[in-house]
């Protein structure tokens, strides 16, 4: 029997909007090659081959990153522009209707990992929160599936150019 690649999805308990989309999809097409696990507690995520960290609002430390072979995150901006928090919301507030979605490796610095894959979300400008989240989830799932299809043959591309940073949003934004 061929050993399956162990995949974990880590969600933030307080920001787990994407977990329902991911769990609903189930990635059945990939079950022969991968085993999938879902977590909201980072302390339970150890010794995985791939960890997708989605909607997570906390910074993960070096110890966590070293416990797993490959940690990945989806970030919705044209990196290195727009590193940081709530990039979709900040860009919508700036009237951007095409937003880049990146699958990146994680290192110890916020959103500074190498880019693996990219796609684009297009907005009309009149979407409500649920529709925005649906488009984000759809783009994220497509990037994850594209990555899984290519794995272990993927290319890391360094981020280039001037960087900008989005601060955390608060109740006054």
Regions found by a protein language model. Name each.
Residues 1-173:
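One-carbon transfer enzymes
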């Amino acid at each position: 029997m061929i050993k399956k690649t162990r995949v974990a999805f880590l969600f933030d308990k307080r920001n787990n909007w994407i977990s329902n989309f991911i769990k609903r999809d189930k990635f059945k097409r990939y079950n022969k090659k991968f085993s999938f696990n879902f977590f909201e507690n980072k302390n339970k995520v150890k010794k995985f081959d791939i960890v997708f960290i989605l909607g997570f609002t906390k910074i993960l430390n070096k110890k966590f990153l070293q416990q797993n072979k490959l940690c990945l995150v989806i970030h919705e901006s044209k990196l290195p522009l727009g590193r940081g928090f709530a990039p979709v919301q900040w860009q919508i507030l700036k009237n951007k209707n095409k937003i880049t979605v990146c699958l990146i490796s994680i290192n110890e610095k916020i959103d500074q990992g190498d880019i693996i894959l990219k796609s684009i979300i297009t907005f009309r400008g009149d979407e409500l929160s649920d529709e925005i989240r649906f488009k984000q989830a759809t783009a994220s799932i497509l990037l994850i599936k594209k990555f899984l299809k290519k794995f272990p043959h993927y290319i890391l591309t360094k981020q280039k150019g001037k960087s900008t940073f989005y601060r955390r949003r608060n109740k006054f934004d």
